[in-house]
Amino acid sequence: MKTIVFTGGGTAGHVMPNIALIDILSKEYRCVYIGSDGMEKRLALPAVGEENYFEINAAKFRRKLTPQNLTLPFKVARSVKQCVGILKKLSPSLVFAKGGYVSFPVARAAFRLKIPVIIHESDASMGLANRLIKNKCAAVLTSFDSAAAKCGKNAARTGSPIRQSIYSANKKLGLLSTGFDGKRKIVCVVGGSLGAASLNKLLLEALPLVTTDYDVFLISGKGKKLPVAAEGFAQTEFADNIFDIFAAADVVVARSGANTVFELAAMKKPMVLIPLSRATRGEQKQNAEYFFEKGCCLTADEDALTPETLKGKIDLAIAGADKMKDSQRRLKPDGTKAIAEKIRQ
């Protein structure tokens, strides 16, 4: 059985797409993950097993001039050396890198050993690690055609790797989780790991207005529950069955991280996207603009939002749900099978 090395990390957005691919390729290949002793390990280890998770000391890239950057070249060199040792031991046929600082030394080590590398970029613009390694890769795959257009002849737009469990999402189980009966339209609000606090604050202000017409379910994030109890409102810190909850929702208000928007589009969910304004290179705004131009969502500027404008966006998303779903269908967001086929080649 051939071995494929998966890598990527720094945020969950660099890990979860790999897990989506591992889920469908693990019967054909030995799937190994190289990551740090952090979030990658917590998320990826259950997918590959302890014997197939290899931990490295990856140096985080800092975009600003800081004293830590003075030692970065030495830290990266040590990480690359560590990865060379791991790859020599594994002798993989391919390295699949999903971006983030964790993937950089793995890819560099693979180049040194002449192991083919395929990268995938989820966002509308390419992240730093992928930009640094793309020219030596066997293939550059992207979720957005705008990213593929800037990456040369080896680039192709495939769509995004998506967890196939979205297609077995159960609306009835989602309703049970929310506590709502489905007689009114349901709005699900989720801010993600980085953008929950400010989105929760906005919802708190808008809640009296929004709940006049809709039931609202908030996935608040750990330790970020709203200090309020109101009719037509329910919340949880975290949801293991988030796809069931999405299935029960009539519209989702969310940040515009690539994984979130592609999964929601694959589920054909009307959405109001509120880009995280402090995203590192403005990628969330670019993602939201792309989906808006394709007719797949509505967008809102966080700094300009009021309770009234948020309610208005939700009203418009509900009214335009059928058109939005048609646009999402035409977009063909799920690239899991296409990417798996590229890996098999």
What feature does the model see in each segment?
Residues 3-9, 30-75, 158, 301-303:
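Conserved nucleotide-sugar phosphate-binding/catalytic loop shared by glycosyltransferases and other
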Residues 30-32, 50-51, 111-172:
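Active-site-proximal region of nucleotide-activated glycan assembly enzymes
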Residues 33-35, 39-49, 167, 171-173, ...:
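Donor-nucleotide binding loops and adjacent catalytic segments primarily
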Residues 65-94, 112:
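An amphipathic, basic-hydrophobic alpha-helix
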Residues 92-94, 247-262, 269-270:
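Acidic donor-binding loop of glycosyltransferase active sites
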Residues 294-322:
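C-terminal "capping" alpha-helix adjacent to the active site of nucleotide-linked donor transferases
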Residues 316, 332-345:
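C-terminal alpha-helical cap of glycosyltransferases
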Residues 322-333:
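A short, well-ordered alpha-helix in the C-terminal region of glycosyltransferases
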